[in-house]
Amino acid sequence: MKDKNFTGIPKELQPWEGFDRNNEVVKISVDKRRYGKVVTLIEGIDPKVEDINEIAKSLKKKVASGGTVKDGKIIELQGDHRETARAQLESMGFKVQMV
């Protein structure tokens, strides 16, 4: 049953074949905004492959903070959550780089 191809697309042309989260490098940085507020920025997650809204939702729950997805590709978390976000993203299988 595992070897069945239900899509009709040859295995070598299937876009999800060979995908590995370790190939993506996610960059985490901190930006200071108005009135001295700090925002954690997470960039480098491919929105075509990953559901960036679900990743943002799980990160917001983990750090107990508000946040948003800007331009469909950048996750902003309110506050300095670099270490917690790094640990969470690494547990999801991403390669993380702190900037």
UniProtKB/Swiss-Prot annotation:
PROSITE patterns: SUI1. SUPFAM superfamilies: eIF1-like. Keywords: Protein biosynthesis, Translation regulation. GO terms for biological process: formation of translation preinitiation complex; regulation of translation; translation reinitiation. CDD domains: YciH_like. InterPro entries: DENR/SUI1_TIF (IPR050318), SUI1 (IPR001950), SUI1_arc (IPR022851), SUI1_arc_bac (IPR005872), SUI1_dom_sf (IPR036877). The keyword Protein biosynthesis applies. The keyword Plastid does not apply. Disulfide bonds: none annotated. One of its GO terms (molecular function) is translation initiation factor activity. Belongs to the SUI1 family. PANTHER family: DENSITY-REGULATED PROTEIN, DENSITY-REGULATED PROTEIN HOMOLOG. HAMAP family: SUI1. This is Protein translation factor SUI1 homolog. It comes from Picrophilus torridus (strain ATCC 700027 / DSM 9790 / JCM 10055 / NBRC 100828 / KAW 2/3). The lineage of its organism: Archaea, Methanobacteriati, Thermoplasmatota, Thermoplasmata, Thermoplasmatales.
